[in-house]
Amino acid sequence: MKKKYWNIKLEDMLEARVHLGHSTQNWNPKMAPYISAKRKGIHIINLTRTARFLSEACDLVFYAASKGKKFLIVGTNNAADEAVARASKRARCHYVNKKWLGGMLTNWSTTETRLQKFRDLRMEQKKGGLNNLPKKEATMLKRKLARLQKYLGGIQYMTGLPDIVIIIDQHKEYTALQECRTLGIPTISLIDTNCDPNLSDIAIPANDDAMASIRFILNKLVFAICQGYFSQLRKP
């Protein structure tokens, strides 16, 4: 796989606070190779390592997208949810940004059934069918539709398992990560200093609590995905 240049600059990462890890008391010793210093009780992430692994991840998603592969982005913490939705829509990726429902991937047949119910309800609502129902039943179905939209809206067009999953906040999305490992789906994880870098195929050391840091990482990845899709369209 030929390496490409993704314009990952040290000053931009510093401005986005990518380098700020967790408290020195809340860390995983496996992250030691990715930590450059301690400052005021906080571990400082080695941004040279961040740039290296982010670049590798961009290469991977670029070439995967150029072959028409599908992506799922998962990030449900308060700092990530909006950034995940926006980035995913830009790159036409599937996403989960509110809550990971256990078995979403490993029990795909159940997820497919839920998605079909969701699509059917949406279609019924668009046609005005819910307005013809008794008030109590219509209210119940509208609540159900709102719940399905909240938790499945980002994967409503997903017709099969994703080829690559991008995970923000390894701790919070541990169930999603384990499902990917069970199914052999490659993962790219943004990992803070309290994470295990060995659990993902590509682990990008970065601050997973700051919105600016999450946006920086996601912007680079979705840009690479978009470039990959564009390169596919340009092929004769």
UniProtKB/Swiss-Prot annotation:
Under the heading InterPro entries, the entry gives: Ribosomal_uS2, Ribosomal_uS2_bac/mit/plastid, Ribosomal_uS2_CS, Ribosomal_uS2_flav_dom_sf
What are the alphabetically sorted keywords of the record? Plastid, Ribonucleoprotein, Ribosomal protein
> What Gene3D superfamilies does the database record attribute to this sequence?
Glucose-6-phosphate isomerase like protein, domain 1 (3.40.50.10490), Helix hairpin bin (1.10.287.610)
Domain of life assignment: Eukaryota
Share an example GO biological-process annotation for this protein.
Answer: translation
What sections of the sequence does the record tag as coiled-coil? none
List the CDD domains: RPS2 (cd01425)
GO-annotated cellular components: mitochondrial small ribosomal subunit; plastid
Q: Where in the cell is it found?
A: Plastid
The protein's GO terms of the molecular function aspect are: structural constituent of ribosome
What is the similarity comment for this entry? Belongs to the universal ribosomal protein uS2 family.
Entries under NCBIfam families matching the protein: rpsB_bact (TIGR01011)
- Which protein are we looking at? Small ribosomal subunit protein uS2c
Q: Which organism is it from?
A: Cuscuta obtusiflora (Peruvian dodder)
